Amino acid sequence: MKIFNTWAIALMAALCAQAQAQTKFSAEDFAKRPEAWEVALSPSGNYAALAVPTADGMETQLQIVELATGNTQVLRFARQQHVIDVVWTADDQVVVSRAKMEPLKARPSTIGELMSSDIKGSNQDVLFGYIPDVGNKRGRRKDEGWSTITKVLNGEPGMALVDFTCWNCGDEPDTVIFKVNTRTGDRQEIERGDKLATYSFDQTGEPRLRTTWDDQDEPVLHYRQKKGAAWTPLPKSIAGYKLYGARFAADNNTVYALVVDDKEPAQAYKIDLEAGTRSKLAGRSDVAVSNFMYEGMDGVPFAVTYDADKPSLQYTNPASEWAKLHAGLMKSFPGQMLSFSSFSRDGNKVMFVVWSDRDIGSYYVYDRTTKQAQKVSDYKPWLKPAEMAQVKPIEFTNRNGEKLFGFYTAKGTGPKPLVVMPHGGPFGVHDTWSFDSDAQFLASRGYAVLQVNFRGSSGRGDAFLRSGWQGWGTKLQEDIADGVRYAIDNKLADPNKICAYGASFGGYSALIQPILYPDLYKCAVGYVGVYDLPLMRKTDALDGASKRTKRFFDRTLGTDDKALAAVSPVQRVADLKVPVMLVHGRDDKTADFNQYKAMEAALRSAGRPAETLVVPGEGHGFVKPENIAEFYRKLEAFLDKNIGPNAK
């Protein structure tokens, strides 16, 4: 680890930005796992905890690094297990979530079990999870559910609040809040709520705000004026239609939260619960506030961020010392974004992460007394930012006159062979101005990449999200095609060299686009896609999904199988005239493997067999780096002969 002052940070950033001899990075370079998934600063400010994948990628270890010396203690919780979501509950105690690698995710995902350890690894325990019986020994834990730390009680070292939801307790299981001693595993139930309740806590750890869901899947908001008081409806005059991201100030009455009044983009508010009033801190009419930035561990906000177009921030309190610190650090990293991620208890040390469209990110610790910064970890240092492609935010108007955002990734200028890459979901997610491994790999091979945040994407408010419902094969596809025409009209794309590629819903879009807009495309690549929408509805109905999940799919996809068949690539295969590549995990349970089989058979019957890649043991997207790298190489070869240098 290296220590340097703020002017040295600026010099280092400038040197890193200088162009160097261009390197052709391998598929393995983009597929390789990072040096650390995440980093968290201890409350004392003396240690950093790093979730570090092993060289073979089969597990994640927790490394405890003493910042002053670099001395490292490696904690292993279980062989071939991953851990994530590192939380310090005391100066010498950490809690992690047991995790597994999830397809299409940039990092491991929790499986709902919590484990604790002291920093020497000598006292480890399962706090929440299922420990099976072994021989005559009965497992101590039999928690069949999902657990998450929701608050660390900073005034009580080692104590935390855990949210627990049962796995097998019906469609709407109770949410139980436990106060847990993370050193001993002792727990005490302090709150129980139905209707999938979620809670916000004041700084004493008292549940004060609660969100549940009615039978129409709309949010219901309640609050508790003080400990022991009854839950009462939160007035819409302060809570609006929806309130989330709430945090209590030190007075345990003032709340900072994101509020949606009538399905518009979320705005940032300061709320006085006792007075029943609120004041707006920040917000835009076209883009939702995505997050607050806070003054230290338990402080008030000094800024908000937006990320639906190019990420930006707005200082809500420019006079704050924290705002000044943030602005000063930002000057040391021009063209990048910087977020505070964790703090020491006294606020003297701050961990921050720096990232951009060309840089996945690096973690630093800044000492406010010495004004020195210490780099703790890079995410993928072998991918040199100066040799990555720029991600350019774009804005255009669709055929209905609606403003849409998107991103264009390419090296250099001028019309290029274009890969159109719709995001998955399709609802409630959106592409961002950030490092995307798929896009950067393709850009390194000479292609431009277009990503469109079509109607139904998140980050623009509930009205924009809902405007895409029941538009899988219509409205959403119109927006993608309008984005392609924008790229052509603005000399960003070679109109004779365009291919569609995507995963999940993006895989569906990749195949339906050349059916609906045959004049635009020369090829299509479907990766773990859905190609028969009526079959998807039938499969999901038999799959044990909850009533709430089924209602959501009916509401967002539609229930008219005839109409859905009309926009399904399997049923429209006669209109699919371009070369196709199909890629799927044999164990995919999200876009069921039957989807791949139906599409492959339809293309074969039509006399236009697809190029294929099927990998046993993989699911909804590939997890193993070697399989991701193999896919990248096959994707490169397919594009090369259809829109690349060897295209006819």
Regions found by a protein language model. Name each.
Residues 41, 50, 88, 396, ...:
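Conserved hydrophobic/aromatic "anchor" residues
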